[in-house]
Amino acid sequence: MTESYFASIAPIEFEGAASENPLAYRYYDKNRVVLGKRMEDHLRMAVCYWHTFCSEGADMFGPGTFHRPWHIGPMDQAHAEHKLNEAFEFFTRLGLPFFCFHDTDVMAEAHTIREHVDNLARIGDRIQEKMAATGVKLLWGTANLFSHPRYMAGAASNPDPDVFRFAATQVRHCMDLTKRLGGQNYVLWGGREGYDSLLNTDLKQEKAQLGRFLKMVIEHKHKIGFSGTILIEPKPHEPTKHQYDFDVETVYSFLVANGLEKEVKLNIEANHATLAGHSFEHEIATAVALGVFGSIDMNRGDPQNGWDTDQFPNDVREITTALYYILLGGGFTTGGNNFDAKVRRQSFEPADLFYAHVGAVDTVAQGLINAAAMIEGGQLAGIVKERYAGWQGELGRAILDGKMSLEALSDGAVAEGITPRPRSGRQEMIENLVGRYL
């Protein structure tokens, strides 16, 4: 057997905060108990297949620089299995419990719809064997409905019903495989479900198609007995000018309009929040408040660039506040932290993939430790509770319970001659408080 591409890298171990080994975890101790649960079980971290094993390091101005062995030659079954073997070598050396994939990431290239179905089933057998041998689990699967030229005008929102049918075929078989592999979620990302120009777009028609597609996905989920969660991943633009799943609020409105808000949750990506003009924690807190928080694509964007840079997370403060709101919402159930991130074009050596993931894992672990301390301290929650205390009183409850009319409120306010006075929001004090946990 040919030596693994990653043979020079030993399994990554926890060595503690004092370690100077760049290929060791300093904060991620998977068995450390945080808020009554093992760190590994809190964070449920996953490696993504696409950026890690499919990216060739190309950009708009130059060709690939990575030259991985599995990038050479036609993407036939032998190459797909070569890539799969290396992927599981990476997963096991990194020691994370989950991975995620698109159908076309893992399978041999297909030239017909029949080949697509057959090739996916064939590689599915090999994936099942590798999972059984290593204990690595599948966080979620998804179908790539954006890369092939057939999807240049969208998949579910495409003007051509045959493209819609092809997309439906991919989703059906990818969900079937996800179920077979014990996947805990199935993701829908509408990379080209949007438009580049309104001049050739029928918005009402396309949104009706999207709604029907999603309903069929839910119907199939129940038909096959898939117990996982269906997730939608919001993104405002790129590759289209405007995407229909713009942000959390937009997706929630779409779900409500189609009566699916109890069936679907959201997979929130940090970089997509940046592109939508939101903070990462805003999108998380909004999803938690609306009851649709599901999972995380953990990465970072660059606020000075207007595109999806998909960098590995390294901002402990941002991750701390993000995880604080996740913990407040009860934490993950079927979801987790998928590292939807890629090494930079100049980082082409095998070790670079490990440096990137080790740093990201430790950043998230630090964030969890800090967020847990904030929860245990209780000061921030206490400040917020006190700020809204009036709504827990008799008047506040009567308003929210629908026992007061606009007229009654107005008459009472005038009769009492109320003179509300502003109260400080204490923003700077609260920011200082959070800083003490970092």
Curated annotation (Swiss-Prot):
<dbReference type="InterPro" id="IPR013022">
    <property type="entry name" value="Xyl_isomerase-like_TIM-brl"/>
</dbReference>
<feature type="binding site">
    <location>
        <position position="269"/>
    </location>
    <ligand>
        <name>Mg(2+) 1</name>
    </ligand>
</feature>
<keyword id="KW-0119">Carbohydrate metabolism</keyword>
<feature type="binding site">
    <location>
        <position position="297"/>
    </location>
    <ligand>
        <name>Mg(2+) 1</name>
    </ligand>
</feature>
<protein>
    <recommendedName>
        <fullName>Xylose isomerase</fullName>
        <ecNumber>5.3.1.5</ecNumber>
    </recommendedName>
</protein>
<comment type="similarity">
    <text>Belongs to the xylose isomerase family.</text>
</comment>
<keyword id="KW-0859">Xylose metabolism</keyword>
<dbReference type="GO" id="GO:0009045">
    <property type="term" value="F:xylose isomerase activity"/>
</dbReference>
<feature type="active site">
    <location>
        <position position="105"/>
    </location>
</feature>
<dbReference type="GO" id="GO:0000287">
    <property type="term" value="F:magnesium ion binding"/>
</dbReference>
<dbReference type="Pfam" id="PF01261">
    <property type="entry name" value="AP_endonuc_2"/>
</dbReference>
<feature type="active site">
    <location>
        <position position="102"/>
    </location>
</feature>
<dbReference type="GO" id="GO:0042732">
    <property type="term" value="P:D-xylose metabolic process"/>
</dbReference>
<feature type="binding site">
    <location>
        <position position="272"/>
    </location>
    <ligand>
        <name>Mg(2+) 2</name>
    </ligand>
</feature>
<feature type="binding site">
    <location>
        <position position="310"/>
    </location>
    <ligand>
        <name>Mg(2+) 2</name>
    </ligand>
</feature>
<comment type="subunit">
    <text>Homotetramer.</text>
</comment>
<feature type="binding site">
    <location>
        <position position="269"/>
    </location>
    <ligand>
        <name>Mg(2+) 2</name>
    </ligand>
</feature>
<keyword id="KW-0963">Cytoplasm</keyword>
<keyword id="KW-0413">Isomerase</keyword>
<dbReference type="InterPro" id="IPR036237">
    <property type="entry name" value="Xyl_isomerase-like_sf"/>
</dbReference>
<keyword id="KW-0479">Metal-binding</keyword>
<feature type="binding site">
    <location>
        <position position="308"/>
    </location>
    <ligand>
        <name>Mg(2+) 2</name>
    </ligand>
</feature>
<dbReference type="InterPro" id="IPR013452">
    <property type="entry name" value="Xylose_isom_bac"/>
</dbReference>
<dbReference type="InterPro" id="IPR001998">
    <property type="entry name" value="Xylose_isomerase"/>
</dbReference>
<dbReference type="GO" id="GO:0005737">
    <property type="term" value="C:cytoplasm"/>
</dbReference>
<keyword id="KW-0460">Magnesium</keyword>
<feature type="binding site">
    <location>
        <position position="233"/>
    </location>
    <ligand>
        <name>Mg(2+) 1</name>
    </ligand>
</feature>
<feature type="binding site">
    <location>
        <position position="340"/>
    </location>
    <ligand>
        <name>Mg(2+) 1</name>
    </ligand>
</feature>
